[in-house]
C-alpha cells in the first residue's frame, strides 16, 4: 500500500507538471474547456488502482545447465540469533514520516471542512433571501460575501454582497448570477472538494499548490466561456465589468467566486480573445485530450515499468527500501488491527 501511494504521489506530480506546461497552449488553441479538462489527468491517476498481476509481463529466468555448481547456504538457528534492539532507531524514521504525512493530509482536509462549515453558517445566519433560481438554488445577500459566489453541494446557494444592487447594473447582475448558477450546473462545487482532498494528499508538494491555483483559474475561465457562448461584444463588456467589480483577495477554497484578483488578468485577456470553435476543432480537442489521458495514465500506472522506475528512483534518492517500510508499518498497525477485530467480534 505504501509503495502504491509513493508511486501515485510521484506520478500525479509529474502529470500536474505536464498539465501546467500544456494548459496555456491548449487554452489558446482549443479554448478554456479543453484546458480545464486536462486536470482530470492527475485526478484520475490519484485513484487509479495497480495493474492486475495477470496483465503484467512475466520475466522467465533462464534454466541453468545441469553441470552448474551447486550453492551451499548456511543457516543460523533461531535460538542463536541476537535479539533485535528495542526502542527508537533510525529504521523507524520512514514509518514516522509516513505517519506525519497522513496526519498532515487528514488535518488539512479537516481544517477546510471546519472552515467551510463556519463560513456557511455565517453567511446563512446573516443572509437575506432573494429568491430561488433554477428551482433549487437559493439566492441570498449577505455582508460576509465580498463578491458573488456559489457554495453548497447538496443544498445549493448563491451568495451576493449586500450592495449587489448598487454595485452592479441589471445586466451585470444577471450575468453574475448566470456565472454562479453555471458552477452549480457543471458540478464544480463537488469537483472543488475532490481537488482539496488531492491537495491534502500533496500538502507538502509545491507543484500541487501551483497546480491547484491553476486548476481554479481554468475552472473560472471555463465557466466564463460557458456563460458567454455566442455573446455579443456588449454583453462581453458588461461581463468584464462585473468581474472587475467583483475583484477581491480573500476566497473560500471550496466555494466558487466570480472573481479573485490573482485571476483577473488572465480572465480579461480570455474575454477579449473569445472565438467560437468549429465542430471539427472541438473533435480534435476531444481526441487529443483522450489520447493524452490514455498515454499519461497508461505510462504511469502502478505495475508498469515506469512505476517501478519511480519506486526505484525514490529508494535511491532517500536510501529507504519501501518494502521494508511497508513491513514496519504493518507490524506497527498489527495491535490496532487486533483490537478492531476483537471489537467486531463483540
Q: How should these model regions be labeled?
A:
Residues 2, 83-117, 147, 245, ...:
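Cytosolic-facing loops and C-terminal tails of multi-pass membrane proteins
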Residues 159, 168-181, 185, 189, ...:
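Short alpha-helical catalytic segment bearing the HExxH-like zincin motif
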Residues 22, 26, 30, 182, ...:
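Juxtamembrane interface helices immediately C-terminal to a transmembrane segment
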Residues 147-169:
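Active-site scaffold of zinc-dependent metalloenzymes
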Residues 1-136, 153, 164-166, 304-327, ...:
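Hydrophobic membrane-embedded segments
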Residues 52-54, 114, 119-121, 178, ...:
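Short helix/loop segments within enzyme catalytic domains
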Residues 186-216:
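A Zn2+-metalloprotease active-site environment signal
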Amino acid at each position: 500500500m505504501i509503495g502504491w501511494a509513493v508511486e501515485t504521489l510521484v506520478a500525479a506530480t509529474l502529470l500536474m507538471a505536464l498539465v501546467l506546461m500544456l494548459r496555456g497552449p491548449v487554452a489558446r488553441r482549443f479554448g478554456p474547456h479543453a484546458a480545464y479538462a486536462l486536470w482530470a489527468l492527475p485526478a484520475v491517476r490519484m485513484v487509479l488502482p495497480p495493474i492486475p498481476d495477470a496483465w503484467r509481463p512475466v520475466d522467465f529466468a533462464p534454466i541453468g545447465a545441469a553441470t552448474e555448481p551447486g550453492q551451499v547456504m548456511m543457516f543460523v538457528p533461531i535460538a542463536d540469533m541476537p535479539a533485535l534492539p528495542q526502542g527508537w532507531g533510525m529504521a523507524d524514521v520512514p514509518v514516522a514520516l509516513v505517519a506525519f504525512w497522513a496526519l498532515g493530509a487528514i488535518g488539512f482536509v479537516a481544517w477546510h471542512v471546519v472552515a467551510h462549515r463556519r463560513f456557511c453558517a455565517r453567511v446563512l445566519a446573516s443572509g437575506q433571501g432573494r429568491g430561488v433560481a433554477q428551482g433549487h438554488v437559493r439566492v441570498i445577500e449577505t455582508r460576509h460575501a465580498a463578491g458573488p459566489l456559489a457554495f453548497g453541494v447538496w443544498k445549493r446557494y448563491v451568495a451576493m454582497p449586500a450592495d449587489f444592487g448598487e454595485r452592479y447594473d441589471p445586466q451585470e447582475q444577471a450575468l453574475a448570477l448566470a456565472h454562479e448558477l453555471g458552477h452549480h450546473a457543471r458540478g464544480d462545487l463537488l469537483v472543488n472538494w475532490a481537488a482539496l482532498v488531492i491537495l491534502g494528499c500533496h500538502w507538502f508538494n509545491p507543484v500541487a499548490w501551483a497546480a491547484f491555483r491553476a486548476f481554479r483559474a481554468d475552472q473560472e475561465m471555463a465557466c466564463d466561456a460557458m456563460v458567454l457562448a455566442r455573446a455579443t461584444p456588449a454583453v462581453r463588456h458588461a461581463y468584464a465589468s462585473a468581474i472587475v467589480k467583483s475583484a477581491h483577495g480573500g476566497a473560500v477554497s471550496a466555494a466558487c467566486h466570480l472573481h479573485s484578483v490573482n485571476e483577473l488578468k488572465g480572465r480579461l485577456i480570455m474575454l477579449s480573445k473569445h472565438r467560437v470553435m468549429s465542430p471539427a476543432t472541438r473533435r480534435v480537442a476531444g481526441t487529443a485530450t483522450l489520447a493524452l489521458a490514455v498515454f499519461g495514465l497508461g505510462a504511469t500506472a502502478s505495475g508498469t515499468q515506469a512505476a517501478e522506475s519511480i519506486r526505484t528512483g525514490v529508494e535511491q534518492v532517500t536510501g529507504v527500501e519501501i518494502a521494508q517500510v511497508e513491513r514496519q508499518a504493518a507490524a506497527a498497525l498489527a495491535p490496532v488491527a487486533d483490537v478492531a477485530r476483537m471489537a467486531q467480534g463483540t
